[in-house]
């Protein structure tokens, strides 16, 4: 009888554990914590202005760049004067102007997002139109919050002189002094020889002396990603996440340079599900080089088909913006921008 009681107790405990860790069928937006609020019910890839008063974001992939005032909550369109705008990202410069990323025109999802992805300058002046910078890039760019320094990665699709499978990180400056914006002082600071590490620039830190980037590990059965950092002066590279076989994509960095946000699949250890860029949530990683200090910030992947992604930190470190998405959609696709206030 004691054995039976013990067995029943174990079974009940197991059932409770399974129930606790099962993903909920409900909507995560119906269960937001008090420090999270919805800014928009559409849009993706948000970026916070240097003065923390506005948030730029994309209405959709291959669409228009938008701007929301955090005080009035009024939303305006930055590129609606561009016919058939097909941009993928909008990012603030320290001057208050913008960098746009995207193709000249939409051809197809793969070609327009890879071969034709390029940088544009958009003045903050009302009615301004985007100006091509003549620079093809892969995915996103790192934009300094202190200067006009930028960084980006390239693959052979954007730089035909690169061998297939290789990639490189380039640091440069944006020159606005001559009237026509121009990219100068381009320097390759790191290169990868194969697809075991496909590079993407993310954020500057330590007064622009260092750069956070992601190493996408695309060889082998598991598609992982690691949070990396490079000292631009010495070339020293550090793997901050140290978790091979798992997905850890670097996102917005905190202003003190001690922590960065990460899109990670670490919760799959408890929740199950396929690992990789689909089942992700937002985590915070201490940049101490141990890879052990991870803190989960959002719980959207606790819900069936839910994920949170693309976090960006305000320059005062008091809040971040991020987007809600669906696990089955391509990376970067979002359905609303949210604001997350860090608890004091």
Protein language model features and the residues they cover:
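Positively charged n-region of N-terminal signal peptides that target proteins for export
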Residues: 1-4
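C-terminal motif of bacterial Sec signal peptides marking the signal peptidase cleavage site
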Residues: 14-15
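Sequence signature of WD/YWTD-type beta-propeller architectures
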Residues: 19-344
């Amino acid at each position: 009888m004691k054995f039976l009681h013990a067995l029943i107790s174990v079974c009940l405990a197991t059932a409770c554990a399974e129930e606790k860790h099962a993903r909920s069928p409900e909507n995560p937006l119906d269960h937001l914590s008090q420090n999270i609020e919805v800014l928009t019910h559409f849009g993706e890839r948000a970026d916070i202005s240097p003065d923390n008063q506005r948030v730029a974001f994309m209405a959709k992939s291959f669409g228009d760049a938008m701007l929301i005032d955090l005080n009035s909550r009024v939303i305006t369109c930055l590129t609606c004067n561009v016919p058939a705008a097909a941009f993928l990202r909008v990012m603030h410069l320290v001057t208050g102007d913008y960098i746009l990323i995207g193709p000249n025109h939409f051809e197809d999802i793969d070609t327009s997002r890879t071969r034709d992805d390029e940088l544009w300058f958009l003045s903050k002046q009302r009615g301004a139109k985007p100006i091509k910078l003549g620079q093809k890039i892969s995915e996103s760019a790192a934009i300094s919050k202190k200067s006009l320094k930028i960084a980006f990665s390239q693959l052979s699709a954007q730089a035909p002189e690169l061998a297939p499978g290789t990639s490189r990180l380039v640091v440069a400056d944006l020159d606005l002094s001559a009237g026509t914006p121009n990219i100068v002082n381009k320097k390759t600071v790191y290169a990868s020889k194969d697809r075991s590490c496909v590079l993407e620039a993310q954020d500057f830190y330590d007064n622009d002396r260092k750069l956070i980037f992601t190493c996408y590990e695309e060889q082998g059965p598991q598609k992982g990603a690691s949070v990396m950092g490079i000292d631009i002066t010495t070339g020293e590279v550090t793997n901050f996440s140290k978790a091979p076989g798992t997905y850890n994509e670097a996102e917005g960095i905190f202003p003190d340079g001690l922590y960065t946000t990460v899109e990670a699949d670490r919760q799959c250890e408890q929740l199950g599900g396929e690992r990789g860029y689909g089942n992700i949530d937002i985590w915070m990683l201490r940049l101490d080089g141990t890879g052990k200090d991870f803190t989960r910030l959002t719980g959207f992947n606790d819900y069936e088909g839910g994920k949170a992604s693309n976090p960006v930190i305000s320059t005062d470190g008091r809040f971040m913006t991020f987007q809600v998405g669906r696990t089955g959609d391509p990376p970067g696709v979002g359905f609303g921008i949210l604001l997350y206030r860090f608890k004091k």
